[in-house]
């Protein structure tokens, strides 16, 4: 049935009164209520909101993928203009018809490319399958087109990549393969569901730039789903703000950023860490979060003057950590991953030192090596004047009371079979510190300290949100009154407002207890807010280290400048200049066994500010 008269001129998609619900224990739970929007050809509509707001289920409803997951979808109108200019009602299409629509007319990029790509097929086979299905091409023609698509998404050595499997590619490469697959049939509408959330800032900048370039070439309508307002400012023409399943505000990107009307939109924007917001300030400060209950209330800024002079609590000298790679018929170690190479730094009581860099730079391995969670092959680790890298396992366990770890994924680091009260109690039991009643009181106090209720102790991890689970992990890390906490990407997977709350909590705890943090992150805007000092890692080595203000306001190393330039700015009028970022991946840090890498030489360029002198600018940043 033709529907062309019902679609406005220029529109490629129109949705009216979309309602989505799920059945849970005989009860209908509404996920989206009365949602209406349209999308024009060549336009980018950003749908923003926090986890649970209904963004992703809206995208799945458009793709007609919710019915299989038990979703109940009702909609007055869901019109799509196909590439052939025929207008169809999506809700009226049969399963067989939808298979032709998906990929050919409407394509989707998912958040996690590793789970979206089939691990047993090569990249070339997976892209070619979509082309053969929708374009009736032969296998040879499909492989030629697959290579052309990989070239189009700026993947270097595309012919070689065609024969590789997904696990052999980096996260940024896999996401580009997903984009190539989604665009292989030149769809009228592309839905991108959080395609850059888990990526490093430089890879994120590449993906955003790539989507914009390809959208222009193909005149595509793009629905971009995200909770990152910096990304929204970078890519969107219009914005739809969702809160608890409803659209609370919609408008042009300039209207939303410069004159937000709804309290939730204002709260969302206030929680965005703005790179440069700490300019001229020497000490970390709390995020100025806005409460939905009291939107006019502003909390006074408090400087984090917590660093204690004297001897450092942690001293690291020439730390080396390498991983063996086996190959050949005899499965011998022939090569090694040089994850950490001659890394040295100090950490003072009450200080936050941030380790920043892209995936593969060695920052997480450095943090894990400090607690001997990964093996180190050289160097010294001195805690409170005592060398700990040579301690026996028994003595190391006692030391772990004073150095605690907060992991990136709180759900994976909590036992799903234990109540959270038992999880927090476990370190106290292992070290035999408190008897039963005192331990229970300590758990209640810790839960209150991280903003939860004492009665939450009886619940299980799956009953909490991501932000609440991260608070539980912080409570567990605090149980033993540690002197040092290593936080490895502890807030990177959280919504922007939850992220601000967790950072504020960490700062409060540092003020109250004098804890030193080693904060490992790739989010430069968060690092700017929380850090006293910053160390930039590249290919396993520190290439710049110094006071946060010096590193951010006067970056000396080209790699530091590249990281800062890639951060999305939540200001639509400030357009980032076009740069050739698209084929820029880290060089390999895999070397032949026994091969030594020259350690960088750090030179002092200011008070406490040290920078490596690269042999050539090209070695650190391709222009």
Curated annotation (Swiss-Prot):
Keywords: ATP-binding, Cell inner membrane, Cell membrane, Hydrolase, Membrane, Nucleotide-binding, Repeat, Translocase, Transport
Gene3D superfamilies cross-referenced by the UniProt entry: P-loop containing nucleotide triphosphate hydrolases
GO molecular function, one term: ATP binding
UniProt topology in membrane: Peripheral membrane protein
Catalytic activity: glutathione(out) + ATP + H2O = glutathione(in) + ADP + phosphate + H(+)
Disulfide bridge positions per record: none
The EC number(s) this enzyme carries: 7.4.2.10
Pfam families per UniProt: ABC_tran (PF00005), oligo_HPY (PF08352)
Residues that, per the record, bind ATP: 49-56, 357-364
Compartment(s) where it occurs, according to its Swiss-Prot or TrEMBL record: Cell inner membrane
Superkingdom, taxonomy of origin: Bacteria
Entries under SUPFAM superfamilies matching the protein: P-loop containing nucleoside triphosphate hydrolases (SSF52540)
Cellular component, GO annotation: plasma membrane
UniProt-listed PROSITE patterns: ABC_TRANSPORTER_1, ABC_TRANSPORTER_2
Swiss-Prot/TrEMBL GO biological process terms: peptide transport; transmembrane transport
Cross-referenced PANTHER family: GLUTATHIONE IMPORT ATP-BINDING PROTEIN GSIA (PTHR43776:SF15), TRANSPORT ATP-BINDING PROTEIN (PTHR43776)
Similarity remark: Belongs to the ABC transporter superfamily. Glutathione importer (TC 3.A.1.5.11) family.
Subunit structure: The complex is composed of two ATP-binding proteins (GsiA), two transmembrane proteins (GsiC and GsiD) and a solute-binding protein (GsiB).
Role played: Part of the ABC transporter complex GsiABCD involved in glutathione import. Responsible for energy coupling to the transport system.
Protein's name according to its UniProt entry: Glutathione import ATP-binding protein GsiA
